[in-house]
């Protein structure tokens, strides 16, 4: 999916595998249509608009913005990535584990796509600053609110059928890294990015 960076308008959209449009126009080719319908690679299925998947690290900028706006992190404050985040069970391993990134600020967290950094930001978003009580619901609600600000709570608006996006419903630490139950199509993610 290629979008205009200024407007979000879709400029090009392709899916794979494909099929020969010429064999479906004009006179019908029932044998070819049957072949397409029985093909296990699903060439009639538009992966760009219908296939949903976890956004992964493309979601991390939303978490960074949420952390900064909610003032649970400062622009220059560092979080020390030890390679394994142990505040939740099961523990979350950074992609660099058994190595570690060490101290990172928000820019470093994004540059290194550090799972530990974003798990800690989510944990802070889920912790009441007055009572220091941790609430999964509070963390998830905050992540959902910020994802919605970027339009991830609704279809992209492209003029062909598309799947409905799914905002996370659990596990703020994993959701903050683009895992959890976040689920979006490529066209929805392209409009956000």
List the predicted regions and their residue ranges:
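Beta-lactam-recognizing serine transpeptidase/beta-lactamase-like catalytic domain environment
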Residues: 3-57, 62-193
């Amino acid at each position: 999916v290629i979008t205009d960076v200024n407007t979000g308008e879709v400029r090009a959209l392709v899916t794979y595998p494909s099929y020969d449009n010429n064999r479906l126009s004009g006179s019908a080719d029932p044998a070819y249509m049957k072949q397409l319908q029985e093909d296990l690679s699903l060439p009639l299925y538009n992966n760009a608009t219908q296939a949903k998947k976890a956004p992964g690290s493309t979601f991390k900028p939303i978490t960074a913005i949420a952390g900064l706006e909610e003032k649970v992190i400062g622009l220059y404050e560092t979080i020390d990535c030890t390679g394994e985040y142990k505040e939740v069970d099961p523990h979350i391993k950074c992609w660099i584990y058994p190595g570690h990134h060490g101290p990172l600020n928000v820019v470093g967290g994004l540059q290194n796509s550090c799972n530990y950094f974003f798990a800690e930001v989510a944990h802070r978003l889920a912790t009441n600053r007055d009572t220091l009580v941790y609430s999964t619901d509070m963390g998830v609600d905050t992540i959902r609110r910020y994802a919605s600000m970027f339009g991830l709570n609704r279809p992209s608006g492209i003029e062909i059928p598309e799947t409905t996006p799914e905002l996370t419903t659990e596990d703020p630490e994993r959701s903050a890294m683009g895992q959890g139950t976040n689920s979006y199509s490529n066209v929805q993610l392209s409009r956000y990015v």
